[in-house]
Amino acid sequence: GPGISDAEAGSSFEEVTRKNNGGDFFNVNNYEADLEKAKELLAEAGYPNGEGFPIIEYMTNDAGYNKPVAEYLQSAWKDLGITMDIKIVEWSTFTPTRRAGDFEICRGGWVYDYDDPSNMLNLLASTSGNNDGKYSNPEVDKLLEEARSTADKAEHYEKLHAAENLIMEDAAVSPLVYSSDFYLQNPKLKGTWHSPYGYWYFMYATMEE
């Protein structure tokens, strides 16, 4: 699917990340649950056992697994003594509210519509209309512009990897899941096409007897 545009045949975007960054962004050993360490860091920040930490609000829409995810996050923060309120709104309200940046923490998602990492990273450019969190880092903007303007493929990906490193260091977003599509198809249905981007095409579909 998308996300392998700078990978050699037979490899994946994870392998490219290891090659260009010296390792994965996500290291299981570094990110295993460590409640005591989290409490220690919270105390160092001036909030022992979460005391004095302001109540935070997580906004999400009311579809699918979004509510269970919100409830899990609420439970995880509760273990640190942090209170998280869940604000569930209908999609018609959720989208414009998120677009306006009127939230503390908010669920987000994106489906690639062209096969290049810039499709995801450009969302976090300060001038992007899809930058709902209003994240702004001039160095990230500079790297994204350099990636966009170069005709050299290797340099293009080098700039994007550098921008991604900064974005992750800033914790501009906190990736939770990569979603997958599951489907059943009648073997009599022929001529359909399912693109790597999740779109179904039925213009040439036929149903055999």
Residues covered by each model-derived region:
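Long beta-strand-rich cores associated with HINT superfamily self-processing modules
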Residues: 183-209
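Short, well-ordered beta-strand elements
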Residues: 53-62, 84-86
